[in-house]
Each structure stands twice: as structure tokens, then as C-alpha cells.
């Protein structure tokens, strides 16, 4: 490992060769000299690839991963590496060369050191949860690192995506990834900063990355490593990339991350020495264009690297708060130099996420990317690929970032404001897309976008930070998830997606890995798997899936895809399990429809991988990403949860839209870009709706994933398994799949396309990956074509969003995708189908709201009387009470108990009604009130009253008289007693002698008088009362005369008779 520590500046790994990046020289020695590091790392150069692989899967890296103390800032042993990074001043601005044209030209990403820093978290603050609007993204600029990344639009969108270039790593893809990674790295690096240099070696980086992530120290230089080119666009950009990759302070890196493509900035993240890696990219760029298109970072070779790095890295990342970063870094480190850088990301991915979390987190994703990148770089060829994916992921640095939502942080890019992804993405996106290609993961693109989101990221990373901790890889995933949500749409899930993305990228072959990444958000685990990466990757994906699910429904789906190969079954399961949680997210994902969403994470992964291999893939990637972003918000991360929550589906919708944009597969990259663009363009930026974005992703992913798979497939398979063990169980299946897939690539591919459309499919694709790029493209195109249309349709259904997206996918998937995929798709789609029927989602919700409001009003009017309320309650009470009293029984002692029914208390209020009618208690006009006129009763009427004769008899008077008589009698009795007493007490002779006796006598006398008086008065009253009856006879005569005859019917008469 020590070699890792300081990669030998001397020779960059082959991949790196082209751009050895000054890495060693310019970047921090440790980080940057990717080549050297890489070599040292394991075999560095030549060996590197294998080594990486080893590392990833089972080699040192993984252990490293395991080892990485989550907490430790210092990168593992590698830590030393970090110091080297040191050199880059935090403030150093990084310029990203023109990323893809798409990217906004000259998007400067300036990140304040702070932003960049691990503090990323703080960055997040900007908008912790909500996706940051583009402006917000800007905020990210806060990134500590002063890094400024300028993106040149100029970069052509070449699918090649210079991303790789960016990576600078040889591993183009790697680079891209790198960038992504870088971004992540930034953060990672930051972590790294902690004193020790990162080791490029898996170890270093990872550690460093973690350290960087930790952000703890900006010191590390972050290499911007911008992937400047966004990745797609200009392959040429790579150079830019290099530029970027200048070691920027780690913090800056973060910033970089911000940059969109350059976002690669992630590179900044790269911050790590990786920079050098990036350099490689440049060379790569060209390649990138080619197959690299994926650019990617593709760096196929890297794929191996990927495997290597990532895993280890992830752990590291986990360790650092940056965690994500660390791990990422760690992993990266493992990878080649370049790779390492990338790797960093990769590992970083998870880590990055974490690290990045703050910043790039996304990078973390990148991590995946990174991994890829790194890997790539390492093995430029293969390795890179792996990385690449991530790369593009990274590439989207942002992407990666995205993944991690951390990246989000980075997102600083702000650019993205756009929907989740932020238009930025547009440019970025294109990048992304291309990235995607290189990234391989669709996500990447999206991711990239995400990256932008990343700004959001700041927030994002917050989340993910936390997540990280759990485990390197898992962290990321989890982290992501959280982040994702918080992050903008893009991150969205995905973060998970992103993460996954990266992962995938990294995984490349493993597209899965990406997936994992996605999960990363969720699981991150996958990421970790990165290490497995490649192979593991596959597994990772699965795990990602598992993870993702949480974040994204898609993810859940993805798994299936992954599963597709052999895993399929397992994967799906995982998915499902996971999925559920995410469900809401998922739905959005579904929305994404494109599977994208689902795929989001997954897809990306897949794509990324493929992408690495093909451009087309890239497109997919994009879609995926979008979906992710869309989804994320839905997930609830949305800044304005209450508002948005209501219609989470919408998010999905956004995704959908994106999908449409994508053009034919071949154009995948382009398409992706377009989509991305649209996404970013869409006003919805902050909104959760990233619909557009999603779509894009979808398509490409398919291809990509295939490719990646193939890449990894052979190499990684074995390795993969180990990772899987590491990962959540779900991951394992993936791994397996990865291993077997190589041979099946073609078949897998075919499935994949379908799958891609369906989010789940994407996953699948990844698994299958092994197919050659060409195949990929074909499949992709096939998928794409149909998918897109589907998607469009979906779009309309936004409201249904969630469900719908799914449905869209299914169609495609079914035919193309493997059965398991189809299943997944179906699952996803089903809901959509159900949903579809409705109007657009927006309207529907309104409708519901409307109904609700009216209902409430009605309820209030009708029910709200106190009366009713009380009755309702009383009824309940009564019911309870009725039950409670037992039937009557006699106890042992013979006492009889009878149940008593509680009766409501008698109140004047019982019949009081107080309805909510304003006029109820008020008279509005004088005419409302009339004085009641008393009628003088006519004799006839009186005579006809009921009981008149009885009254005339005076029975009441007699009754009263009798009672008065009783009173008189009582008084008379008292009077007699008093008289007797008085006579007994007072002897006539001594009457006056005793005062006491005298007083008693007086009192008795007084009472006697009172009694007489009362008796007299009562009698008087009684007499006068009875006088009323004196006229009785006369009255009765009149009554009988007038009353009776008149109204008696014949029947009554007969009865009387």
C-alpha cells in the first residue's frame, strides 16, 4: 500500500499514460499521481487493472474497504497520500475545459472553499432538502475550494464524453468518472486533506477520499479533474479535464463538482491527486469518443479498476463523515492512479457521496464513477470502463454526485437548477448523457444532472453523510438516499441513482454496481461493492437495488434487471423488498417510467456501464438520471415536502418527459443530452418534477449496462461475488450475474434494452452487460425508440406519474427484456397502467383538493352543529356503556344487581341547534318579526275545548281547598300543643319570678298567636277560592248549550249513543 501512498509519479499506468496527468506532479502527489499510485497500488500500470479488479472484488481493496474506519479521517494507511494533495490551495480555481457543448458554456463553478469542504454539509444547508434551484446550485459554489470550474460548452458533445477526459484519467471514462469522482473526490479529497495523502492506491484514495470526504481537510488538493468535458461533449475536453484536474484543493474539488460536467468538478473532488488521473483522460478523450463514448470514463479497462477501487474506497468513505468520500476515495485509491482518482470517486462514490456528501457526495456516486474511473484509469482499458461508468456518473460528476446526493452538494453546479438535474445538466446533462455514455450509467447523465442538483446537494450530502457512516458502501447508498431526497430532484433518488450510477459506472461491467450506487443512496452498499465493483458491481447493483428501492422505486426494479442475468430472480427480489420502501419514490421512479426512474439508480448503473462502452448507453444514462431526479423529490426529499408531497407522482412525471426527449439510441448520448437539457431547461427545476430528466436516462442505460457488464463480466465475476457477500444479500445475486454474464452479453443486451425502458430493465442490462458495444447500441436503439414514445405518452399522464412511468417501460421491456426484467417492468408498469386513465396528474390532484375543500365545507355546514357532534360522541359512549353493564345477577349474599342504563344528562342544550348558517340567529328585516296577537276566545271555541266540563267542575279548586284545609289542621294541632306547654311551664303564681321562664313563656305566646293568624288567613283564602265555583251551574249550562252540538261527527254521536 505504501506504494499507493505515493504513487510513483514516475509512470502513469498505461491508461494514464496519455494524460498521466500531471497527476502525480500536479495533483497531490498522492492523489494525483494516479498513475504512480495506481501502479503502486497494485500493479499499478499493467498490474493495475488486474489489481484493481482484485482489489475491488476481493483483493486488498475490499479488505481495505472493510478496514476503512468509517470515522478515520485519514485515509487509511493511505492517508499519507492525502497530504500531497495538500498542495492544491483550497482556493485554487479549477477550470474545467469545455465540457460538453451541452453544458452551459463557461459555466464557472466556483466553489468557495467552504463549500467544497467537507463542510459540504454546510453547503447543503443551502437547501438541505429541496433540490436546489439552479441558482441554488450556485450556492454550492460556496464550495470551500475556491475552485472555479469553468466549463466550456465548446466541448463537443461527443459521446465520447470526454468525460473520461475529464477524468483526465487515462481512463477517460475513468476520468469522466473521475470527474465525477473528482467531484466526489473533492469532497473526498477534502477528507483526504486530513493530513495523509490519499493513496491513490485503493487504500490511499479511499482513505484520502474519505478524508477528503471528511472534508476534513481541504488541504488535499482537489483535482478538479473536471471532467470538464462534461463528459459527453467534448471528448477533447479531456484536456480540459486535465486542467481541471489540476489539483484543486480538495475543497475546491468539491466545487468542481459543482461544475456540471466539469462538474466533473467532481474532479475537483478529485481534488485528489487524482487530478493526474484526470489528465489521463485527456488522452482518453479521443478514445472516449469512441467506445469510450461512454467516455467515458468508460475506460473500460477501468472497469476492473472499478471493482477494485471502489469497494475499498467505499469503506473508507464511510469512515469519514465524508464517509462517503472516504470510502470512495479509498476505493479510488486502489484503482489506478487515474483510476485511483476515479476510484476515489468510486469508492468515493459511496464515499464521495458521503464526502461529497457534503459536496459531491455525488461524487460518491462518482465513486461509482470513480471507481470506474479510477478503475479505468488503472486499467485504462478495462478498468477505466468500470470507473467510467461511475465516471460518467461522476460525470456527471454531478452524476456521481448525484448519486450521492452528496454530489448534489457539489452540485453546486447549481447549474442544474433545472429539474432535479438542473438544466445545467443540459450542458451538463449532455455531458451527462455522454457521460452517461462514458459513464455508462444513465444515471450518470442524469446523475450529472443530478450533480447539478448536487448543489442541492449540499443539502444532499447532508443526508448522505449520515448514511455513510453506516458502511462504506452502504453508506453511500443510504446516504444517498437521504440525500437524494433532499437533494434536488436529480439526485433524487438516486442519488441513489446517482450513486448507483456511479457505482455502475464504476462497476461498469457491473452495471449493477452502479445500481448499487444508486442504492448507495440507499445502500451505498453497493457502492461499497464497488470494490466488488466490477464484479461486485453487479452484485452491487443488486444491492443497490435493494437500496435504491428505498430511494427509488426504480431501483427496486432495477434489481430485477440486474437479476436479469442469472441473478435476475434474486435481484428482483431484492428490488422488491427494497422497492417497497421507496415506493413512493419508486412510483416516481416508475414515473420515470422509464424505468429510468427505477432504473434511475439502477439504470444508471447499467447504463453507465454500457455507456462506458457505448455512446448510446450514455443516452440511457441520461434518462435514468432524470428519472432519478424526478423521483427524488417525489420521494419527499423535496424541499417543500408538504406542498410537493401531495403529488409525489409528479416527480416521476418529470422523468417521463425526459425520456421522451431522448432520440434514437444511437444518438443516445446526444439524446441524453437533449433530454437532459430539456430537463434542466424545464422550469421545474426546483420542483420536484424532473420529469424530463428521467426519460432521458432510461433509454441509454440499457446499452450501457450491457457493455459494462461485459467488461466486468469476465474479469470481475469472481470478484464480484465477494463483494456481494459484503454487500447486502441482494448484491450477491448481482455478483453472480456479473460473473456469468460475460458469455451472455448479447442476450443480456437484448433484454436490457427493453429493460432499460423499464427502469428495472436497466438494471438488467447492467447485469447482462457483457454484450459488445455494438450490441449495446442496437439493443439500446431498439429500446430507445419504443421507449421514447412510450415515455412521451407517459408524460402526459404525469399525474399518474408514478404508476405510469412504469407502464411505459414495461412494454419495451417485455419484449426485449428478459423475463425477469419483464416481470419487473410489469410490476412497475402495472401501477402506471392503473394510474393512467386519469387526466394529467396535476389536474387530478387539483380535482381532489377541490373535492376535499367542498366536502369539508359541506361537512361543516351539515354536521358541524354542536348538536350533531355531541350526538355522535354520545352514541359512541352509549355503545360502550351498553356493552359494559353486565346482565342483572344476584351475588352470593343474595343482593340483586340490576343494570342501569346511563341516560344522557338532561340539558337545555340538547335541542339547541347551532348550524353554520349566518342568518340562523339573526333577523335581517323588520318583516321577519311579528308581534303575536292574542285572540279573544269565543264561547263556542271554549265550549269545544277538551275537558272543558271537568274544568268547569272546578276539581283543581277543590284540590287546593282540601290541601289548605290540611294546613289549617296542622296549624291547629301546633296551637294546641303550645297552649298545653304554656300552661305547664308557667304556674300562675310564680309567673313573673324567673326571667328564663318568663322568656320561654313569651315565645310560646308568640307562636300561638302566629298559628291563629295563619289558620285564619288560610281559611279566608280557601273560602274565597271556593267562591269561584258558585257560578258552576250557569257555566256548565252555557258550555253544554254552545259547545257540544257543534262539531260532533255522526260517528262520534253513534259511539256516544
Swiss-Prot record:
Residues 41-54 have a biased composition (Basic and acidic residues). Residues 1-68, 289-314, 556-594, 624-692, 827-880 are annotated as: Disordered. InterPro entries: His_deAcase_cplx_SAP130, SAP130_C. Keywords: Nucleus, Repressor, Transcription, Transcription regulation. Its main location: nucleus. Residues 579-590, 624-642 have a biased composition (Low complexity). The keyword GTP-binding does not apply. Component of a mSin3A corepressor complex that contains SIN3A, SAP130, SUDS3/SAP45, ARID4B/SAP180, HDAC1 and HDAC2. Acts as a transcriptional repressor. May function in the assembly and/or enzymatic activity of the mSin3A corepressor complex or in mediating interactions between the complex and other regulatory complexes. This is Histone deacetylase complex subunit SAP130. It comes from Gallus gallus.
Amino acid at each position: 500500500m505504501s506504494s499507493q501512498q505515493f504513487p510513483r509519479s514516475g509512470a502513469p499506468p498505461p491508461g494514464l499514460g496519455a494524460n498521466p496527468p500531471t497527476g502525480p506532479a500536479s495533483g497531490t502527489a498522492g492523489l494525483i499521481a494516479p498513475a504512480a499510485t495506481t501502479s503502486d497500488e497494485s500493479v499499478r500500470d499493467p498490474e493495475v487493472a488486474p489489481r484493481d479488479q482484485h482489489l475491488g472484488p476481493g483483493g486488498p481493496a475490499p479488505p481495505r474497504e472493510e478496514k476503512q474506519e468509517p470515522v478515520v479521517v485519514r485515509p487509511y494507511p493511505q492517508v499519507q497520500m492525502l497530504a500531497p494533495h495538500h498542495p492544491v490551495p483550497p482556493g485554487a480555481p479549477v477550470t474545467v475545459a469545455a465540457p460538453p457543448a451541452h453544458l452551459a458554456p463557461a459555466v464557472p463553478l466556483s466553489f468557495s472553499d467552504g463549500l467544497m469542504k467537507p463542510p459540504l454539509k454546510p453547503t447543503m444547508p443551502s437547501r438541505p432538502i429541496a433540490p436546489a434551484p439552479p441558482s441554488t446550485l450556485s450556492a454550492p459554489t460556496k464550495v470551500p475550494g475556491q475552485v472555479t470550474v469553468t466549463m466550456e460548452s465548446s466541448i463537443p458533445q461527443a459521446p465520447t464524453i470526454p468525460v473520461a477526459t475529464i477524468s483526465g484519467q487515462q481512463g477517460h471514462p475513468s476520468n469522466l468518472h473521475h470527474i465525477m469522482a473528482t467531484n466526489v473526490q473533492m469532497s473526498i479529497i477534502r477528507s483526504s486533506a486530513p493530513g495523509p495523502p490519499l493513496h491513490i492506491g485503493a487504500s490511499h484514495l479511499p482513505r484520502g477520499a474519505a478524508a477528503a470526504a471528511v472534508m476534513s481537510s481541504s488541504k488535499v488538493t482537489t483535482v478538479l479533474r473536471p471532467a470538464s468535458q462534461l463528459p459527453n461533449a467534448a471528448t477533447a475536453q479531456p484536456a480540459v479535464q486535465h486542467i481541471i484536474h489540476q489539483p484543486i484543493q480538495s475543497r475546491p474539488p468539491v466545487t468542481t463538482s459543482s461544475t456540471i460536467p466539469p462538474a466533473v468538478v467532481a474532479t475537483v473532488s478529485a481534488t485528489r491527486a487524482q487530478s493526474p488521473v484526470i489528465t489521463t483522460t485527456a488522452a482518453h478523450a479521443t478514445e472516449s469518443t469512441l467506445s469510450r463514448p461512454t467516455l467515458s470514463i468508460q475506460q473500460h479497462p477501468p472497469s476492473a479498476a472499478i471493482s477494485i477501487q471502489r469497494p475499498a474506497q467505499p469503506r473508507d468513505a464511510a469512515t469519514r463523515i465524508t464517509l462517503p468520500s472516504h470510502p470512495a476515495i479509498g476505493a479510488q485509491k486502489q484503482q489506478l492512479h487515474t483510476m485511483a482518482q476515479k476510484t476515489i470517486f468510486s469508492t468515493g462514490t459511496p464515499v464521495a457521496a458521503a464526502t461529497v456528501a457534503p459536496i459531491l457526495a455525488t461524487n460518491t456516486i462518482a465513486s461509482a464513477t470513480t471507481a470506474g474511473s479510477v478503475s479505468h484509469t488503472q486499467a485504462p482499458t478495462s478498468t477505466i470502463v468500470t470507473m467510467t461508468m461511475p465516471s460518467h456518473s461522476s460525470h456527471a460528476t454531478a452524476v456521481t454526485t448525484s448519486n450521492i446526493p452528496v454530489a448534489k452538494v457539489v452540485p453546486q453546479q447549481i447549474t442544474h437548477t433545472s429539474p432535479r438535474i438542473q438544466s445545467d445538466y443540459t450542458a451538463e446533462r449532455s455531458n451527462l448523457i455522454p457521460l452517461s455514455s462514458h459513464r455508462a450509467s444513465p444515471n450518470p447523465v442524469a446523475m450529472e444532472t443530478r450533480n447539478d442538483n448536487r448543489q442541492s446537494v449540499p443539502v444532499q450530502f447532508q443526508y448522505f453523510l449520515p448514511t455513510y457512516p453506516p458502511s462504506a458502501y452502504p453508506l453511500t447508498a443510504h446516504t444517498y438516499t437521504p440525500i437524494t431526497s433532499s437533494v434536488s430532484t436529480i439526485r433524487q433518488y438516486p442519488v441513489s441513482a446517482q450513486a448507483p450510477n456511479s457505482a455502475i459506472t464504476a462497476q461498469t461491467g457491473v452495471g449493477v454496481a452502479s445500481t448499487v450506487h444508486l442504492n448507495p443512496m440507499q445502500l451505498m452498499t453497493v457502492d461499497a461493492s464497488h470494490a466488488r465493483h466490477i464484479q461486485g458491481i453487479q452484485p452491487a447493483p443488486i444491492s443497490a437495488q435493494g437500496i435504491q428501492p428505498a430511494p427509488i422505486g426504480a431501483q427496486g426494479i432495477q434489481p430485477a434487471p440486474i437479476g436479469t442475468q442469472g441473478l435476475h430472480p434474486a435481484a428482483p427480489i431484492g428490488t422488491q423488498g427494497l422497492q417497497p420502501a421507496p415506493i413512493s419514490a419508486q412510483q416516481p421512479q416508475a414515473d420515470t417510467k422509464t424505468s429510468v426512474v427505477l432504473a434511475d439508480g439502477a439504470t444508471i448503473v447499467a447504463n453507465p456501464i454500457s455507456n462506458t462502452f457505448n455512446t448510446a448507453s450514455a443516452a440511457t444514462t441520461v434518462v435514468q438520471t432524470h428519472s432519478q431526479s424526478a423521483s427524488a423529490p417525489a420521494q419527499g426529499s423535496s424541499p417543500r415536502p408538504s406542498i410537493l408531497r401531495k403529488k409525489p407522482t409528479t416527480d416521476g412525471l418529470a422523468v417521463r418527459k425526459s425520456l421522451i426527449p431522448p432520440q434514437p439510441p444511437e444518438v443516445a448520448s446526444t439524446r441524453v443530452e437533449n433530454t437532459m437539457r430539456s430537463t434542466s431547461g424545464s422550469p421545474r427545476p426546483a420542483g420536484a418534477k424532473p420529469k424530463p430528466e428521467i426519460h432521458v436516462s432510461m433509454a441509454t442505460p440499457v446499452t450501457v449496462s450491457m457493455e459494462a457488464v461485459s467488461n466486468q463480466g469476465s474479469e470481475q465475476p469472481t470478484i464480484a461475488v465477494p463483494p456481494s457477500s459484503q454487500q447486502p444479500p441482494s448484491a450477491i445475486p448481482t455478483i453472480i450475474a456479473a460473473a456469468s454474464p460475460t458469455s451472455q452479453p448479447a442476450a443480456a443486451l437484448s433484454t436490457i434494452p427493453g429493460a432499460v425502458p423499464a427502469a428495472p430493465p436497466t438494471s438488467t442490462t447492467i447485469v447482462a452487460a457483457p454484450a459488445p458495444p455494438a450490441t449495446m447500441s442496437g439493443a439500446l436503439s431498439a429500446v430507445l425508440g419504443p421507449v421514447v414514445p412510450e415515455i412521451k405518452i407517459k408524460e402526459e399522464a404525469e399525474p399518474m406519474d408514478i404508476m405510469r412511468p412504469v407502464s411505459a417501460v414495461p412494454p419495451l421491456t417485455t419484449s426485449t427484456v428478459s423475463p425477469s426484467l419483464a416481470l419487473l417492468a410489469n410490476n412497475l408498469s402495472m401501477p402506471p397502467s392503473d394510474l393512467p386513465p386519469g387526466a394529467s396528474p396535476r389536474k387530478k390532484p387539483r380535482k381532489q383538493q377541490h373535492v376535499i375543500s367542498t366536502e369539508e365545507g359541506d361537512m361543516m355546514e351539515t354536521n358541524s352543529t354542536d348538536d350533531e357532534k355531541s350526538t355522535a360522541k354520545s352514541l359512541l359512549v352509549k355503545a360502550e356503556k351498553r356493552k359494559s353493564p353486565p346482565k342483572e345477577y344476584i351475588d352470593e349474599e343474595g343482593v340483586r344487581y340490576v343494570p342501569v342504563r346511563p341516560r344522557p344528562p338532561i340539558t337545555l342544550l340538547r335541542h339547541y341547534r347551532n348550524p353554520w348558517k349566518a342568518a340562523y340567529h339573526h333577523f335581517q328585516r323588520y318583516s321577519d318579526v311579528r308581534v303575536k296577537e292574542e285572540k279573544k276566545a269565543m264561547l263556542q271555541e271554549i265550549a269545544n275545548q277538551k275537558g272543558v266540563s271537568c274544568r268547569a267542575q272546578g276539581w283543581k279548586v277543590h284540590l287546593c281547598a282540601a290541601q289548605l284545609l290540611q294546613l289549617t289542621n296542622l296549624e291547629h294541632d301546633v296551637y294546641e300543643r303550645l297552649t298545653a306547654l304554656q300552661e305547664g311551664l308557667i304556674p300562675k303564681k310564680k309567673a313573673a319570678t324567673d326571667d328564663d321562664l318568663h322568656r320561654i313563656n313569651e315565645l310560646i305566646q308568640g307562636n300561638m298567636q302566629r298559628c291563629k293568624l295563619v289558620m285564619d288567613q288560610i281559611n279566608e283564602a280557601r273560602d274565597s277560592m271556593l267562591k269561584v265555583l258558585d257560578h258552576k251551574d250557569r257555566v256548565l249550562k252555557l258550555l253544554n248549550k254552545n259547545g257540544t252540538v257543534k262539531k260532533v261527527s255522526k260517528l262520534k254521536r253513534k259511539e256516544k249513543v
